Regions:
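C-terminal catalytic lobe of FAD-dependent flavoproteins
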Residues: 13, 18, 23-34, 42-45, ...
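Beta1-alpha1 glycine-rich phosphate/pyrophosphate-binding loop at the start
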Residues: 5-32, 41-44, 68-80, 118, ...
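Long hydrophobic segments that form regular secondary structure
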Residues: 289-324, 363, 380-388, 393, ...
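FAD-site-proximal beta/loop scaffold in flavoenzymes
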Residues: 261-291, 386-436
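Feature captures the FAD/FMN-dependent oxidoreductase FAD-binding
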Residues: 87, 149, 154-158, 206-255, ...
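Glycine/serine-rich phosphate-binding loop and adjoining beta1-alpha1 elements at the start
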Residues: 40-44, 48-56, 62-145, 213, ...
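A conserved FAD-binding loop/helix module that cradles the flavin
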Residues: 303-308, 313, 432-463
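Beta1/beta-strand and adjacent pyrophosphate-binding region of the FAD-binding site
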Residues: 150-163, 289-297
């Protein structure tokens, strides 16, 4: 603790943001970092608590508290204060493989557990984390680190989302020969296709993929592991297989959409938007929202991202229907929190896009089954040519589970407290095992699964488990 009075002298200052009315016209990142002097002041606010709950990562009565990666937060906050960025990087990456991801998209449960936040404002832990890793890339401290020797053991990681990448990174540094297979055209999974560029730039994801490739990880794209012949081949060619395919099965909308065009799920809409805007794909599965009246069902990050994406595509109008009443979302001061997308909609349209306590009752169609509008439970009819469902996920897609013969019921069943499935040498981790969760929990799952796979291969492990 370099400055015992830091939390008394300095107030919380978050990274600034670009003007909502301006940023909706491009796909560039909207957060702007603080100057180094102000960032060091934010590091000085850390109290170096006797019990740093920020890094506990525990689940109590069904609620998660603190960082599941057990980030050494007080240590690198102190190093930010002293300007020792290199040492801060070494302590940060000891627990977190991808701070450039969590520093952008994590809801920061560490800050909710910050002792400084009990009677004041918590430390800007997420922003501080991002500043350390971005400084490391800018100063070229982040260089490829190949293992000193290879074990000769071959591991296949199926899926290249945050859990799969974290496991691959850990196992590669342990010296195993790691191949990551991905059914999409590019690796990254949710990070590449499920989060808009303005929140998580795709060049940031690709930068990490390139670094891992230089360190020895092999990526194979366009390979669908739900094919039984492919699954058998992978099991025969590799000493261990780790399934990290996410929980991408969307929760049904409960509407009669048979024969109706203009209805999709949030993940489909976001993926198509990324493919067009960032990956240069001319045709995508879901049409652009340009010139359309868009209605989004659901709340949470995916729904907000769909609002922001529709605005950038030039929609005519956008409305977000939230099932629960507005009172359920008010903070302690009776204010309604607004996500970045809601701020943008307010700036562009002059109104909050959310309507609370309302659901879609039925659909209105025109010629050839084209969606024309939606009838809501309060008796209103909204014009709508694109209806997007963002109501969460039911679990993992069954195809890969069936191909590998692993037992699953929405999520893959593994040994109690572990990651081994009912099939010899096949493991599972991430949302596929845990269910829909945060990127930071997926990374924690990947790290812990890597330790178990390493134990299986070598008879012992020196890899750390996060959960």
């Amino acid at each position: 603790m370099g400055k015992p009075t830091g939390f008394l002298e300095y107030t919380r200052r978050e990274d600034t943001s670009r003007d909502p009315a301006e940023r909706v016209h491009d796909w560039e990142e909207f957060h702007l970092p603080l100057p180094e002097e102000l960032r060091r002041q934010q590091g000085a606010r850390c109290m170096n608590c006797g019990v740093p709950f920020c890094q506990t990562g525990m689940v109590y009565e069904g609620r998660a508290f603190g960082c599941p990666l057990h980030n050494l937060i007080p240590e690198w906050n102190d190093m930010i204060l002293s300007g020792n960025w290199g040492h801060a990087l070494s302590r940060l990456t000891k627990a977190n493989n991808f701070p450039e991801f969590t520093g952008r998209v994590c809801p920061a449960p560490c800050e909710h557990a910050c002792v400084c936040g009990i009677y004041g404002d918590p430390i800007t832990i997420r922003d501080n984390e991002l500043s350390v890793i971005e400084d490391a890339f800018a100063s070229r401290r982040m260089r490829p680190r190949r293992p000193p020797q290879w074990s000769g053991k071959k591991v296949c990681v199926v899926g290249s989302g945050p859990a799969g990448l974290a496991a691959a990174d850990q196992l590669n540094h342990r010296g195993h020969l790691v191949t990551v297979v991905e059914r999409a055209e590019r690796p990254g999974g949710l990070l590449m296709y499920g989060i808009p560029n303005m929140k998580l730039p795709k060049d940031v994801v690709q930068r990490r993929i390139d670094l891992m490739t230089d360190e020895g990880v092999t990526f194979v794209c366009g390979l669908d592991a739900s094919d039984e012949a492919t699954a058998r081949r992978l099991m025969s060619e590799y000493d261990a297989v780790l399934l990290c395919c996410g929980a991408g099965e969307p929760r049904p909308l409960g509407l009669d959409t048979q024969g109706v065009t203009g209805v999709c799920y949030g993940t489909e809409f976001l993926k198509s938007a990324v493919e067009r805007a960032q990956l240069g794909k001319e045709k995508a599965a879901v049409p652009s929202a340009a010139g359309l009246d868009v209605v989004i069902i659901g709340t949470g990050d995916t729904a907000s991202d769909c609002v922001a994406t529709a605005l950038r595509q030039g929609c005519r109008s956008v409305t977000q229907l939230v099932r629960r009443p507005q009172a359920d979302y008010l903070d302690a001061q009776g204010r309604l929190p607004a996500d970045y997308a809601h701020q943008e909609a307010q700036a562009v349209t002059g109104r909050d896009p959310r309507r609370f306590g309302v659901q879609v009752k039925s659909l209105v169609t025109g010629e050839n089954g084209a969606l024309a509008g939606v009838v809501t439970t309060d008796g209103d009819t909204l014009p709508c040519q694109l209806l997007i469902g963002a109501t969460g996920f039911a679990g993992c897609e069954p195809g890969v589970c069936e191909a590998f013969g692993v037992t699953a019921d929405r999520t893959v069943r593994t040994a109690p407290g572990g990651y081994a499935t009912n099939v010899e040498k096949v493991f599972a981790a991430g949302d596929m095992r845990r269910g829909q969760s945060l990127v930071v929990w997926a990374i924690a799952e990947g790290r812990s699964a890597a330790a178990e796979v390493d134990q299986y291969l070598m008879g012992y492990t020196n890899l750390a488990r996060s959960v």
